[in-house]
Amino acid sequence: YQENRKNKVVNRTSSTNIGLAMVAVISAYDMGFENIYASVKLLQNMIDTVTKLEKWNGHLYNWYDIKTLAPLEPRYVSTVDSGNFVGYLYVVKQFLTEHNRLYENVEDYIAIINKLIEQTDFSLLYDNSSRLFSIGFDVNENKLTDSYYDLLASEARQASFIAISKKDVPVKHWSSLNRTLTAMNGYKGLISWSGTAFEYLMPNINMKSYHGSLSVSYTHLRAHETDQYLV
């Protein structure tokens, strides 16, 4: 929802956008808008393009020119966007695995995805002293940004989960994320930095939530408050 939406075309895209585009292809197939052969072919074309993109220690840069495929200045690696992209790669990998008999080279693309995931080193975005992820890495300045994701209710939650699962960062990072509770209109949940649906709900595109869990609790809180705002 945007209150002051501006319609215009920009010749750039981000790592999150690239990953979401892949997931959109899968969603289009699941909803019957596209056939499996066209969907697999489109995903293969997108993966081919990703392999051509310049990267930093396996990470996609935050923004690319869609015509030249060159990274846009200033060159920056976003922790959130990298987490999103790798998360969506796992979805694409699973989708191709389920349909790996349709094309002879599907296994080759699964191998490419595995390599992309493996080469994305999240440890370089992690601050060991605080046990938190930095906002990102300024490649031009060759340093981590001195701001950190310290809340569990954050759009960086997926990046944290994936980095731990890849063993790029220690499990104790998860317990370092703040879990301060709040209550509004009968709903309880965790606080985020700015209370946006983006912070609470973006990771839920991929991450499963279980009934009675803290994740479901703060998801309901955010959904209720968003509904109240729009009424």
Ranges and model annotations:
Residues 1-13, 59-81, 129-148, 179-195, ...:
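Carbohydrate-binding/catalytic loop surfaces
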